Amino acid sequence: MKISHYFEWEDTITGGFAESVNNQRTIMDQRGIEYTTKPDLSADILHLNNLGPRSIYYAKRAHRADVPVVAHTHNTAADFRDSFVFSNLLARPLRPYLAYGYAQADHLICPSDHTARVLDSYCDVPRTVVSNGFDSAKLDGHDDPDLRATYLDRHDLDPPVVFMVGHVIERKGLAAFVETARRMPETDFAWFGYLNPGGGTVDRLLRSRTTTKLVRESPPNCTFTGYVDEVAGAFAAGDVFFFPTKNENEGMALLEAMATGAPPVVRDIETFAWLDEGETALKARDVDGFVDALRSLLDDAERRASLGRAAAAESAAYELGAVAADLLAVYDGLLDRPVVPER
């Protein structure tokens, strides 16, 4: 059994998008599934992770060769907005383009129920919800007090620290993050992640003026660390995960934060309907609400720990070992036989 697991523009795309692709390949490695990262029509299934023009070309060729095509729906026009310079302008033509691209697949994989519902207006291709999951191995050491001390000292942070992990873009709730920090001058806020969309020097040109202005004019207690080479260090340093994102397909950093026992404060959006308010997360819709939610946790260490424990327990269902069966079931269905034979 062989999967052609193609990720167009793999060398330039970073963040959760790339992490999801890595997770899929980790699952295949762990399950002993043969795959190639090239578009190969001699494979049993063509799995496309980014519907660029080359992917659509190979999807059409796959149909002619009677090779089933599955597409991962990492992108929607809505979550493309407020990402980088010109993204809002490009979001309008992107929607019909994605609708056309996704329609070339025999089956779609959606990272959340929310994304699956959004795609109802794109095409009528059958779809299955499969979480992006998270690789718990990359979080090893997050509970190491020495690593925590190193990252707190490196970024001049005093605990308890409110933190976020991910690309610094408007869609992730940058304005709310900065304003909430401004309202809470007694608390250190840290955003760990690329300041440029792709992380590179050239990508600085893609950063929107609004993003640049918000970062430049952020208050002294709001730190933007840039890329960190050991993500476990970010989770070691942080105490409350603050995710005021305006639109999200799933939110892999949220799953990782929950797994480390960091209680999450999130924006109350449809994507996070699966989180129980007051049980596994606190939710708010504006800066006033975020301030109240964060202070309620920062002022009560026992509640902070209790919510963190519940979040960690909830996250177990999203570990790679737990979501692997869902991904393989999609492959099984396309071939009408098990991808991994019983032993």
What are these regions (language model features)?
Residues 227, 246:
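Aromatic "clamp/platform" in nucleotide-sugar-dependent glycosyltransferases that forms part
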Residues 188-220, 225:
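Short, structured helix-loop element that forms part of the nucleotide-activated donor/catalytic region
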Residues 153-172, 178-184, 190:
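Conserved donor-binding/catalytic core segment of Leloir-type glycosyltransferases
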